[in-house]
Structure formats: structure tokens, C-alpha cells
């Protein structure tokens, strides 16, 4: 069984919860979420992200044999809600990505590109929500933000709204940008009920979302049907959103999301199921049509879905962290680390760290003094953004920087 861990575990009610990145040529047995007793290390449960014949979801694979169901990974950190005792985790694309080679583009291929809500004691899937049937390597494993908020989506900016919402009602929700499409989704935490969703950066893969059911309709113009087809896909396989983390401030009830204005000219390279060919696509990146800046930060209200502010810049944006003092810290692919005003987006401070700020910034206090720490060095996301702005030439040094706050 081949698998690897690309992110750390979490602790949930005395258990170590771990997702994993299924290797492209691994079997379905690698694609699992596991819980181990934190005291003994004994495995408590494991949940498969690819159903076996006869299990719920098996029928969504279009008759594809179990041994040819590959790569529904859970390669980023889950979230845990102690009140409901549920774990929330996101999943990735299948291999190959184009579904015409994998039983048909009309099949769901559960549980790829979904949010899974698991009982922390048993690993049972309590509910799931599929964000998109993915033909392009637009994974959805990123952070799920757990928030209690009033819900009043503004139809002027929020494209898809559940008509049953009572504006102003308080809900315990999961929100954020869970996938590379850059679409914000807000779901009820207990039930998975779809509440609202909206795009951010340019996207052309979703035509609509049914507000009443949450069902996503894929743009048929973006679906591959044969080998050697080339299509403009937005965002590209590096996002939109990617693993660089967003942030949330309860003081402003606002989420802050690092994104890239990127698309790709994706071409199908095979009509066969072969894990050695991985996604079955060539995916050269490009700037989104009409864009000149690669990086952007969206500040979005968790209550209304409105854009509070937006920052754009030539260099790609990487991870963010919000502080209680009204600041959002974040780095970019050109080595700049900066502090934004969390209400206005104004850049209040900036320093050149010399190489891409690829690490996740953290803030902590020692003896009453607050600090912000971050690491630098090359990464896949920084590199893909850098190719869109080749006049910027950061270094490659891997360093740790710690800054004291006033």
C-alpha cells in the first residue's frame, strides 16, 4: 500500500486523525482516513474515500473495476468540531482526471472533490457534499473554517443562494474556499445543507449551483470527451486557491483568502486508464484572460459573502494569518512579507525576505510579548506563480524569520 503524508495530523477527542496523499500508482487501499489512539498508537478506525463494490457510492463509478479506482486523497489538514464530535476533511481528484476514461463524465465518482463529515468515534461518514465532478485536477482538500455566524448572503455578489435561508438567522457553518476553483462555499455544519456559494477569481468550470439542493452543474464546454482535446480551464491546476492557507478573524467575521489569477490550456494526453500517466493531462499555466497581476487577496464577509476588500499584486500570494490586533500577515512568491489592515486591506508594513514566503505564518506570545514567525523557500505553488511574472527574481534560501510586534 503506497501513500504519503503531505500535512500533519490533528487530535480529536483522544485520537490522532490523519489523511494521506494516495500515490498515483497506488491501489484504492491507500486512499483512507485513519484514527489512532493518542496514548497507544493503536488504530481505532479507517474510512475509505473510494467505495468498494456493494458499498454506498459504488454505483457512482460507472462500473469501473475497484482496482482501477485511483487517487481520491485527503492530503491537507482536517478540522474538528468538539460540539458535534465530527471531523471535516476534503478530498482530491481521481486519476485519471478526465472522466470519459473513467466510466463517464455524468458519474459522481464518490467521494472525490467532496467535504466529508465523519463521526470522530467511528469514522462513519455522517454526510458529504460534492463540490464538483473534476475533469481537470482541481482538488478540494483545503482548510474548512468552522464559524458561528448570522447568514444573510447578498445576491449582488453571491451567485448561488439557498432560497430557504432566513436572512439574519444564526448558523454553525463550514465556510472558506475548499478547492482550486476559488469558489467560496458555506454549508451547515451539522447536516451539510448548502447555504450559499460565490466565485472569486475567474472560473469557467461551474455553470450553476442549485440553491435548493446544492447540486453543481459543470460547464459542458469544459468537459473532455476524447484524447488530444485542448480547452481553456479557469482556474488552472495550481489555483485559484491552493494549499497556502487562508485566515479568519472573529473580530471582523471576515475570511482572508490568498489566490492566483491563473488558468491553463489543458490537453488530454490519453484515452486509457493508466496511473503512470497520472492525471492524463498536459496542464501549462497562463494568466487569466485580461489579468496582469498574478496574486490577489480577497477579504470576504462570512455573513453576507460580500467582498470587504481586495488586494492585487504582480507576485503570487501565499499563506496568511490573522491577529487579534487588526492585522493580517502574509507572504508572496517574490519574498515579500507584509501586514494588511484587516478592515481596509491597506498594506501597513512590508519587508523583503529574499525568497518565496512559502511557509505558513504563525503568531504566538512569550512572556506577554507577541511574535509572528514564517519560513521561506521554494515551493510548487510559488514556482508556478513565478513563471507568470518572470521579471521577478527571488532567491531560493530556506530560512526561518521571527518578528516581534509592537
Residues of each region from the PLM?
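Noncatalytic, solvent-exposed loop/strand surfaces
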Residues: 1-406
